[in-house]
Amino acid sequence: MAQREWVEKDFYKELGVSSDASPEEIKRAYRKLARDLHPDANPDNPAAGERFKAVSEAHNVLSDPAKRKEYDETRRLFAGGGFGGRRFDTGGFGGFNVGGDGAEFNLNDLFDAAGRSGGTNIGDLFGGLFGRASGGRPSRPRRGNDLETETQLDFVEAAKGVAMPLRLTSPAPCTNCHGSGARPGTSPKVCPTCNGSGVISRNQGAFGFSEPCTDCRGSGSIIEHPCDECKGTGVTTRTRTINVRIPPGVEDGQRIRLPGQGEAGLRGAPSGDLYVTVHVRPHKVFGRDGDDLTVTVPVSFTELALGSTISVPTLDGKVGVRVPKGTADGRILRVRGRGVPKRSGGHGDLLVTVKVAVPPNLDGAAQEALEAYAAAERASGFDPRAGWAGNR
């Protein structure tokens, strides 16, 4: 759901992109800013840390299609300070406060604006804006934002899987109050004004409305003695190291979701998720084709013509691969079950491409042998270009 603060924030400006920017443009802008503003790169610059958090929040909203749609609709509804040119006080939805022209707010303006914005559900929109569900149901603590990070793996690590530490600087549960927001030895109390629901009811003429409780700010609880470390939020920004298990067979560019490892929610609310984008370094010998492992092996002409068994590397050591007599240069030989581990179990195959290596120099014996072979080849009538389209 949208947040009340969205009305006053320009996430597009925060990332330096236009409001019609593509997802790829948003991702590129975020990566550049996050790299420049990351706390690890600016240890003595608190302003960079605050900007980093603002950029992360903007990316969290604009990178999620559902959140971006709701954000755009929210901004359209409140464009110009209100509906139909009248100012609307977002701090008092139940009161229908209007601006300096003294004009009376008409409910029809609200629903007309909703229709123009593409069918926005007013209950859902305002329920999200004011931190509660539509219909006046008790509010729930807001889940923390999702986080994104990147890591690089060697080819073999990506193929076989690996456990690795990942260092993050992000909002995390306060270690002093364990995320409750209350000073150690105390605990939050149920708000007596709203009885823990987070909303209070008001009447406006013939209509009844619910709005966030002003005493607990919609949380349903009151902290009389806030934690000294987090000032009652339950969250502090710190650097932490988590152990990540990268599953076997991960591919370059793939995203891995780690539930509950994202930004901490306020006052003990659930944490968001962490998405890790994996980048795989190329290997000097191996390649990949899905779950199949590919390798090109140099061979001699005689090994192809006469047949042989060659030694081929795999992820688990070398194996012998039989080259049938008369194998053509560039042929692919398949070795089943020697490829990359599959998510569904088992392994892909090893695809071996044989490539003739021509000797740059020949000694006398080799020269004579090849000349004798060439003469025998001509005598047999063999023409390597017979049937070739270039001869037509």
UniProtKB/Swiss-Prot annotation:
GO terms for biological process: chaperone cofactor-dependent protein refolding; DNA replication; protein refolding; response to heat. Its cofactor is Zn(2+). A zinc finger (CR-type) spans 161-239. Gene3D superfamilies: DnaJ domain, Heat shock protein DnaJ, cysteine-rich domain, Urease metallochaperone UreE, N-terminal domain. One of its GO terms (cellular component) is cytoplasm. CXXCXGXG motif repeats lie at residues 174-181, 191-198, 213-220, 227-234. SUPFAM superfamilies: Chaperone J-domain, DnaJ/Hsp40 cysteine-rich domain, HSP40/DnaJ peptide-binding domain. Keywords: Chaperone, Cytoplasm, DNA replication, Metal-binding, Repeat, Stress response, Zinc, Zinc-finger. It holds the Pfam family DnaJ. It comes from the Bacteria. Zn(2+) 1 binds at C174, C177, C227, C230. It is found in: Cytoplasm. Belongs to the DnaJ family. Participates actively in the response to hyperosmotic and heat shock by preventing the aggregation of stress-denatured proteins and by disaggregating proteins, also in an autonomous, DnaK-independent fashion. Unfolded proteins bind initially to DnaJ; upon interaction with the DnaJ-bound protein, DnaK hydrolyzes its bound ATP, resulting in the formation of a stable complex. GrpE releases ADP from DnaK; ATP binding to DnaK triggers the release of the substrate protein, thus completing the reaction cycle. This is Chaperone protein DnaJ 2. The gene is dnaJ2.
